[in-house]
């Protein structure tokens, strides 16, 4: 199937015209940027994919789902879904030289909704993910003290049920069912001032508001100059967390009880593989930790030079990401093993996931260490950096998509900076609802529904179908060969064609069947309207794909067959193997002649 001439107008619509060059200097449009070198791209992607999930989610899932046995489903999903989709999105951005929306428009206009779905997810992610940074900053600032404030029960926010840390053989009576620890009271009564439900949002926590404002200011100045500033910032934000992680790892494995914790982390329980939930956890973890279906990889790849070897980069980055998750497990569970031994309780009682690990379990363990404020500062500084580069790359993804949709509007001097400011301000004000006394319940809604594995799996199904079956896996492989000089491992193509959509569809259907309404802390049940709001958040992204396809089919003129032909044909100015890249803009006359020639063929 040949290509059909098409182009992009200033308002973002696709029309069948002859290719035009993106660089339009006459109207003041700036040339699209590129990375100064490969290292900036690699570190930017590493900063995006290596985030909080590597530290607070993967180790817990590994322990929960059979220890070392969990690596079997994890590796299967890694090679059938993770690496293929990761490579697909990165190569797509590099090939089309476009962001997360227009890249899909240029290879298959009927599936442009994939881009809108991914940007809807990343927009919601931008609102709530940075709230974790606000919490981490609050803890970081609270750590600059001689005695950590969550280490004792002598503060004004503590209750009479507060029981300080102690070993099991201490004489104090701790049998009360209402007994709580100072770290939990610090988290719920000092940091969050948690209300009794989502129906009681209460007042704003102004200390957290200032922390959120600081986080957004840092995020803004990390990307305000585009890849020129992002490429420099990631040299620090993407590498320094590794230093912190190594320091915490060395400290953890030298503690008494560390071996017990690591044993719980890795000891294989093969019988857990018969539980379908283990496989679903492995699949969703791959999508979470590899930043798949968010448009971020497409945006970052679009700033590569055309002949960059993105295949080699993607394989190396995927290995780095999984290795980091594995190493983080040693750092976390060595500390949890120490805490388990010190308190004389089973490790199952101290193992936590998500915010519970970062703001309850680990702070509790830190108090037991000598020089505890130092280790608290190291840990929360690492959390801030891990979350920061993931956050600003997500914002960069959204901004890149908008700029590429409307280049004549935003690709002009200082307008991009204004756009980033607008996105940051809007996201900041929406995020304030999560800093109220009931804000934690709203945060959990966003985390459970808005960027859930269900949404990401749904988008991944259509991504693989679009590239492999509509655009053509063979054609895309030829495009990749034209870029990097050779064809990648053939298994990746077959994953796009068969394994990836099948595995994603099966996991998606299973997640629907096994769906359980959200609860907070296994105690609070959300009202019906809370779950309804959550489903609206989830559907807001998934509905974009079918809705866009129906909209384009209804608005285009002509017979259905002709409309379908126009909507599945890629842009004419996309470079093809053994064909020279376009070197000059087309005129209206050549556009008309070209359209006549291609009237019956794509």
Swiss-Prot record:
Topological domain ranges for the Cytoplasmic compartment: 1-40, 549-602
Q: How is its activity regulated?
A: Gamma-aminobutyric acid (GABA) transport is inhibited by beta-alanine, taurine, hypotaurine, beta-guanidinopropionic acid, 2,3-diaminopropionic acid, guvacine and nipecotic acid. Beta-alanine transport is inhibited by GABA. Taurine transport is inhibited by GABA, beta-alanine, SNAP-5114, nigericin, nipecotic acid and ouabain.
Chain segments annotated as transmembrane: 41-61, 68-88, 121-141, 207-227, 233-253, 282-302, 319-339, 366-386, 418-438, 453-473, 490-510, 528-548
Summarize tissue expression: Expressed at high levels in liver, followed by kidney and leptomeninges, and very low levels in the cerebellum (at protein level). In the brain, detected in some blood vessels (at protein level). In the kidney, expressed in the cortex, including parts of the proximal tubules, but not in the medulla (at protein level). In the liver, highest expression in periportal hepatocytes, with highest density at the vascular side (at protein level). Also detected at low levels in other organs, including skeletal muscle.
Q: Which UniProt keywords apply?
A: Cell membrane, Disulfide bond, Glycoprotein, Membrane, Neurotransmitter transport, Phosphoprotein, Symport, Transmembrane, Transmembrane helix, Transport
* Sites of Phosphoserine modification: 591
What PROSITE patterns is this protein classified in? Answer: NA_NEUROTRAN_SYMP_1 (PS00610), NA_NEUROTRAN_SYMP_2 (PS00754), NA_NEUROTRAN_SYMP_3 (PS50267)
* Molecular function terms from GO: amino acid binding; amino acid:sodium symporter activity; creatine transmembrane transporter activity; gamma-aminobutyric acid:sodium:chloride symporter activity; taurine:sodium symporter activity
- Localization per Swiss-Prot or TrEMBL: Cell membrane; Basolateral cell membrane
Topology of this chain in the membrane = Multi-pass membrane protein
Please indicate if the UniProt record lists Protease as a keyword: no
Cellular component, GO annotation: basolateral plasma membrane; plasma membrane
Tell me where in this chain the PTM Phosphothreonine is found.
587
- Name the major location: membrane
What's the stated role of this polypeptide?
Answer: Mediates sodium- and chloride-dependent transport of gamma-aminobutyric acid (GABA). Can also mediate transport of beta-alanine, taurine and hypotaurine and is the major taurine transporter in hepatocytes.
Classification via PANTHER family: SODIUM- AND CHLORIDE-DEPENDENT GABA TRANSPORTER 2, SODIUM/CHLORIDE DEPENDENT TRANSPORTER
The protein's name in its UniProt record: Sodium- and chloride-dependent GABA transporter 2
Q: What is the lineage of its organism?
A: Eukaryota, Metazoa, Chordata, Craniata, Vertebrata
């Amino acid at each position: 199937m040949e290509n059909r001439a098409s182009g992009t107008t200033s308002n973002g619509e696709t029309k069948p015209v002859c290719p035009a060059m993106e660089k339009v200097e006459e109207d003041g449009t700036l040339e699209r940027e590129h990375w100064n070198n490969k290292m900036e791209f690699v570190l930017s992607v590493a900063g995006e994919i290596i985030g909080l999930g590597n530290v607070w989610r993967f180790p817990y899932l590994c322990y929960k789902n059979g220890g070392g046995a969990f690596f079997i489903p994890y590796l299967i999903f890694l090679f059938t879904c993770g690496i293929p989709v990761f490579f697909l999105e990165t190569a797509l951005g590099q090939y089309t030289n476009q962001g997360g929306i227009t890249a899909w428009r240029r290879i298959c206009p009927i599936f442009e909704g994939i881009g809108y779905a991914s940007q809807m997810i990343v927009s919601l992610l931008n609102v709530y993910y940075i709230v974790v940074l606000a919490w981490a900053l609050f803890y970081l600032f609270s750590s600059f003290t001689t005695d950590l404030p969550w280490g004792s029960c002598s503060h004004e926010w503590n209750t009479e049920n507060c029981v300080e840390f102690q070993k099991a053989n201490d004489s104090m009576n701790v049998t009360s069912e209402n007994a709580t620890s100072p770290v939990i009271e610090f988290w719920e009564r000092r940091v969050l001032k948690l209300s009794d439900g989502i129906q009681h949002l209460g007042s704003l926590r102004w200390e957290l508001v200032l922390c959120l404002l600081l986080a957004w200011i840092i995020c803004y100045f990390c990307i305000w100059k585009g890849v020129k500033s992002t490429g420099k910032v990631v040299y620090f934000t993407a590498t320094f967390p590794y230093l912190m992680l190594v320091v915490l790892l060395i400290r953890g494995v030298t503690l008494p009880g560390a071996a017990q914790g690591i044993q719980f982390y890795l000891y294989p329980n093969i019988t857990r593989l018969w539980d379908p939930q283990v496989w679903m956890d492995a699949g969703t973890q791959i999508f979470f930790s590899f930043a798949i279906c968010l448009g971020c990889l497409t945006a970052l790849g679009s700033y590569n030079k055309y002949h960059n070897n993105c295949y080699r980069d993607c394989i190396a980055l995927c290995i780095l990401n999984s290795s980091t998750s594995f190493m983080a497990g040693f750092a976390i569970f060595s500390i949890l093993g120490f805490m388990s031994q010190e308190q004389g309780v089973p490790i199952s009682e101290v193992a936590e996931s998500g915010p519970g690990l970062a703001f309850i379990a680990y702070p509790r363990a830190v108090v037991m260490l000598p020089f505890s404020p130092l280790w608290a500062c190291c840990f929360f500084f690492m959390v801030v950096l891990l979350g920061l580069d993931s956050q600003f790359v997500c914002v960069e993804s959204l901004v890149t998509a908008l700029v590429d949709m409307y280049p004549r509007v935003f690709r002009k001097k200082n307008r991009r900076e204004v756009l980033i400011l607008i996105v940051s301000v809007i996201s900041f004000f929406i995020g304030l609802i999560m800093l109220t006394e009931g804000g934690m319940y709203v945060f959990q809604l966003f985390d459970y529904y808005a960027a859930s594995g269900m949404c990401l799996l749904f988008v991944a199904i259509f991504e693989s179908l679009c590239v492999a079956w509509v655009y053509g896996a063979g054609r895309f492989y030829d495009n990749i060969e034209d870029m990097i000089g050779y064809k990648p491992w053939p298994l990746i193509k077959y994953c796009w064609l068969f394994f990836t959509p099948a595995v994603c569809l099966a996991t998606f259907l299973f997640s629907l069947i096994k769906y359980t309404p959200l609860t907070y802390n296994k105690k609070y049940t959300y009202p019906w309207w809370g779950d309804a709001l959550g489903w609206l958040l989830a559907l807001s992204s998934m509905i974009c794909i079918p809705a866009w396809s129906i909209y384009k089919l209804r608005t285009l003129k002509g017979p259905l067959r002709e409309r379908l032909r126009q909507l599945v044909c890629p842009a004419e100015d996309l470079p093809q193997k053994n064909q020279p890249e376009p070197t000059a803009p087309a005129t209206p006359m050549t556009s008309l002649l070209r359209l006549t020639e291609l009237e019956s063929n794509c």
